[in-house]
Amino acid sequence: MTIIRPAEMGDINEVYSLAADFATSFDVDRAAFNKTFGESLSEPNSYVAVAETQNRVGGYVLGFSHPAFYANGHVAWVEEIAVEESFRRQGVGRMLMSAFEEWATSRGARLVALATRRAASFYKEIGYEESALYFRKIMQGHDND
């Protein structure tokens, strides 16, 4: 049975492995990951949860809540979601997204948004609609290490 629970510092190695496997834009630097993981767990506007089966982490979601003028209140953004290959097609992604949506609702978020390259059909299946193009700019001194 898979459970979704808040991430803990003890999950750092398994979440790092998932993040490193799924990163498409950056190489995940271990020292930077460790710092960011700890910050994310303690940041009140962030949500980090893991999917666990038989004491093994097979997925995670990282997201944030913040105010937005256009939404007349708070919005929530899924920054990262990853599910290990052996955990796919078992509802784990849906469970992680559902848990994030519950958290977002509890924070007063009026919408949940995300960007994806790999799973557009999955998000459409769970009620998301395509809304905008996604642009990014790597800031000077912070290339994709």
Residue ranges of predicted features:
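Conserved acetyl-CoA-binding loop-helix of GNAT-fold acetyltransferases
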Residues: V83, R89-E102
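Extreme N-terminal starter segment of soluble prokaryotic enzymes
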Residues: T2-I3
